[in-house]
Amino acid sequence: MADALQGVYSAVATPFTAEQEVDETGLRSLIDRTIDAGIHGLVPCGSTGEFSTLTATERERVVEVVIEQAAGRVPVVPHTGACSTREAIGLSQHAERTGATAIMVVAPYYEPFSIAETKRYYADVAGSVSIPVMAYNLPTATGVNLTPSILGELISEVPNLKYVKDTSGDFSAAARLIHEYGDIVSVFVGWDTLFLAALLEGAAGSVIGAANVVPGQLVAVYDAVQQGDLARARYLWKALFPLMASFVSGGYTAAIKGAMDLIGFSGGPQRSPGEEVDSDRREILRQSLKSLGFDPALRHNGAR
């Protein structure tokens, strides 16, 4: 799988204006900043991108803007999963037409679908496109846990399922995926605090919302691992870990946008019903960013 996607992929936040409209100018700036910091790829319209609050038309427009602004500099893997197979197929085909490298697809959610129904959904959506598919396991949101065994069945049944993003937070499951299926699919881990552990275990990379805030720092950890400099990787990760822990402690997207605001790169508010990060967590974020060399008081990014 020499040509497979790998590295640090940003789970791109969707900037909104004060009126909660998609801020295309802010989105373009975010894409440029992230790519300039060395990120390896972009995943728009995922959970961090607040896809559940976007209309299908808005999701398509965000994908168009991201692919246009990336301009071939890095791969773009839009999330195209939806509650219905019909909508997921429409979004997936649009992403392929627009120039996506691959698509990421979460399991259908809200209704408690069976494993058989979920597998059929994946087969139908993947079969509607010719580009690779990344299965997105997010059991806390979907109510369906794509265990290594279930994913193994999907991998054997869906020819273009080439990637898995595991955001279960279950490291043992991620490790099983890596060791049992890593020669067939590339495994990305999406739980921020497991970033280094997953890389050391052999993950292809990570799709991570923290890349909206500290893209360069995450790439530095990844590069150290790739170079075999584990001492440096652990040193860099030790500094980053408090910020990662603050992100996953609750209200993830609010924390990401709060941190973006603190460093002077505002993503705007969460779209309703999401709210801003509370003052206590904002202070924790502020202190974590200060320890990394940022100056949140001045809203200045000290280092990429």
Enumerate the language-model features and the residues they cover:
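C-terminal alpha-helical cap/extension of soluble enzyme domains
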Residues: 2-15, 33, 37-39, 48, ...
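Catalytic alpha/beta core domains of metabolic enzymes, predominantly
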Residues: 127-128, 139-248
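A generic secondary-structure micro-motif detector
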Residues: 20, 52, 81, 184-185, ...
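Residue-level signature of catalytic and energy-coupling elements of molecular machines
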Residues: 20, 164, 285
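A general structural signal for well-ordered alpha-helical segments in protein cores
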Residues: 5, 27, 59, 63, ...
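Active-site beta->alpha loop and helix N-cap motifs at the rims of alpha/beta catalytic domains
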Residues: 2-145, 153
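A structural signal for short hydrophobic/aromatic patches embedded in well-ordered alpha helices
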Residues: 62, 121, 154, 233-236, ...
